Amino acid sequence: MKISFHGQSCIKIITGDTTILVDPFISGNEKCDLKAEEQMPDFIVLSHGHDDHVGDTVEIAKNSGATVICNADLASFLAVEDGLENMAPMHIGGKRQFSFGQVKLTQAFHGSQTVRDGRIVNLGFPTGIVFTIEDKNIYFAGDTGLFSDMKLIGELNPLDVAFLPIGDNFTMGPEDAAIAARFLQAKLVVPMHYNTFPLIAQDPHKFVASLDEGITGKVLEIGESIEI
């Protein structure tokens, strides 16, 4: 399985002949190396409804026929307002089997809304995501602050990789993310959600260097991938 990082919180997972795109914020994101019109994933997974995470989901899903996996409130909105047909609604605590493996949604401490036609629309609870693919567990924290039940996520799902936001201001910063890494005890920690905008400017290498002894961190450059 190959996992690549494409700026902000966008990652791509390729397992066998299946491609999964997570939080595809592409258009308007100078830090992303992808082009929305070229993406043909089989699945799109969304952590929450903010524009810098839903991103180009509607265009990509309509072009590719991808199934969109997300919380049920966001799924309903995308179906009714944007005409998406292949939706897989879930909610926090639930898990579901797909052709590529299992998805389980966890809590995240953040918001989830958009502005449509001048009105603010609440899009349900934000989530983290635990993928179980090829007998590997990948935790994608989404946008969140630090919370102590991250210990439980790590205990219930021994993690091979954890993607953690470090940008501060809108999510936990590097200091809290280092504590999150301690709680989760993943084999590998990858920072995300930083340097897209001035408000979330961070040094990811400094974050990796701050991790507790025994915790391995890796900064993925834009377009870089790991294989697990």
Swiss-Prot record:
Q: Which UniProt keywords apply?
A: Hydrolase
For this chain, one GO molecular function annotation is:
hydrolase activity
Pfam families the UniProt entry points to: Lactamase_B_2 (PF12706)
Q: Which Gene3D superfamilies match?
A: Ribonuclease Z/Hydroxyacylglutathione hydrolase-like
Member of which family? Belongs to the UPF0173 family.
What is this protein called in UniProt?
UPF0173 metal-dependent hydrolase LMHCC_0991
